[in-house]
Amino acid sequence: MDPELLPRVLLPEEEEQQDRRSYRHSFYGLLLTLLALGLCSLTGVALQSGWSPGSLRLVDEILTESKPLWQARLLSSWQAGVEGSAVEGPAAAAAEAGLATEAEPAKSAAAAAVVEADHAAVASEDPRCSEIGKKILKSGGNAVDAGIATVLCMGVVNPMASGIGGGAFILIRAPNGSAEFIDCRETAPAAAHQDMFEGHEEDIRNGGLSVGVPGEIAGLYLAWQRHSRLTWRDLVTPAADMAESGFHVAAYLANSIATYNATILSDPGLSAVFAPGGKLLKKGDTCYRPALAAILKAIAEKGPDVFYRGERARALVKEIQAMGGILTEQDLESFQAQVREVLLGKAFGLDFLMAPPPSSGGAVILQVLKILQGYELPLASAGVLGLHRVVESLKHAFALRMHLGDPAFVNMTDVIQDMLSDEFAARLRSSIHDNITFPPEHYGHPEDESEEDKKRHPHRHQLYAQLDDHGTSHTCVVDQDRMAVSITSTVNGPWGAGRMAVQSGIVLNNEMADFSLPDRPGRIPMPFEPPPAPANFIRAGKRPLSSMAPAIVLQDGQLKAVVGGAGGTVIISAVLQVILHFFCQGYSPFKAIDAPRIHHQFIVQDLDGPATAALKDLDGPAGAALQKLDGRASAGQKRDSAAAVPSRGPGRKLIGAQEAAKLATTEPNFPPPLFGRLTAVSDPRKDGGPAGY
């Protein structure tokens, strides 16, 4: 039967009020996020490039309200399998930053986003940083060397997303097939506790109290100690030189400066660098970061002890405490990066090397893939029915996600076993109905679960509020020996804590915002709002749950892809869909990254993004298409009209321009022998640019 003709079951009229609330969980509500289309940027290394000039202007047209044209193109894109791409529209902040408001020609954008290489390749969010990584590779360095140098560069040119004031996840696969995961995520200071923000919850996102103990330098140094070929100085010096000599402000940084101008102008450290003389830097201006250059040079010569101990550490702590923070010298000195076992999984005939907790990304992606592999292709992910199945699978996985946390503090054995189990995935798949969706309590457990199973696995029936993290940068590297590295680094929110340590030029993280806070006494939750997750409550020395999801994909023991992303919770859905696009739908590498994506994280409270206004007036062909998609709405729920889009409600979030993912793949049977050719892809919507040779 045509899935679009499947019947909808109507609830009794007297249940209309409940029905309207259930509407918030409907697939229709989610699919409106398709209007975000290409706003989520991606980069990577792939087999071949491709581009679709007809859809590159789509979001630009949405934002300029060319409704008849964009509606027709949107409907056409859906019917064609949505293989196009989209660029960011002329937002006011972008215009103020001096950004172009017209889309670049599709062919030149695609050409800048793709590099084919026989030996080694780097995909990052800035072509200058990718070039640094390439130079490291050509000078005899391996993928770890190139990854370290590239990530440090990203912290210089994209400080709103990452830097040495934050943390990172590093996934490494050696040429001999061994793999490891280095966790250098920020930790809560020793004086931290779960009630530390009670009465002033706003401080969890801004200021000194939101700062966790930075871990990036410790993690990069540990990776260097375990895997490097070159000297530490060789890897740190390029970023130090760039910070000292200055660099041109790219469009992405200019946009962020304009968007967060109040944050920058209100902080002496940030304003001195990014608004000298009170004038915000714009695209093409030269930015100088001498204080950061000085500490990077010291780190290059003397190693991470310069950062974590001694005079510079004391100065950093003093500044953070002056901002209201509780971080101490002992917190810095005691930080340790952790080597963890890689999370392993199989789906669609592929082997996945994923990030383990405190990342939630690896487990969620693996569970969704295991659910979807039980469907026949392409309806596991393509078309209206495929999208519905992806969404329902995401809802099941996100329902279990908030039981995860720092393994040093949380016993997650049963949860991880569920999320990696083929049998459990099959039972969840059987609870997905192709014509309806359900209220939240339906998800996270099989539909046919017995009372005995409910008692044995209570986590399946306890729903918790979702962590909604932000920001980050990602880098993928594959070298000539096919060592693969996938690194996600972050200061969490845009511009982290909104503070810069003046003496060191370090943008400070606000990683404490990634913890869950207990409910305030007397607070009345919103409808369908679950309680916060105890597994992610603040504890001294604890790492908060993360959405970062660096991944490496193998087929028959051979490296096939290196994938990762940036952008908070949308990392999970973005990386998932890049994998589905490339391996299951046969997209070219460029299209796999550039194609529109949807996002669902089970329960969220806000609908954000530059295309929000466009969602409120949805008529014509696109509206009709959404009505068909809405045929899988909650049993009996009623739809006011295709134009009725609440600005708040569970289960929807527009994908923003900050997101990025990377794909690195090898093509078998192509010279050099045994390894295959590399194609690096970086999404031009985030100023990304790959490099290789």
Language-model segment annotations:
Residues 2, 15-26, 41-89, 98-135, ...:
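Noncatalytic scaffold domains of N-terminal-nucleophile
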Residues 144-151, 233-244, 315-318, 381-401, ...:
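Short, well-structured alpha-helical segments that form the helix of a local strand-helix-strand
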Residues 65-66, 270, 277-278, 377-491, ...:
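Internal maturation/activation junctions in enzymes
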Residues 518, 525, 542-543, 575-576, ...:
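Extended C-terminal subregions enriched in glycine
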Residues 156-180, 327-328, 484-555, 585, ...:
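Active-site rim segments in enzyme catalytic domains, especially the processed small/beta chain
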Residues 30-44:
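Hydrophobic membrane-insertion alpha-helices, especially the h-region
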Residues 136-137, 218-226, 302-309, 314, ...:
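Alpha-helical support elements that line or immediately flank enzyme active sites
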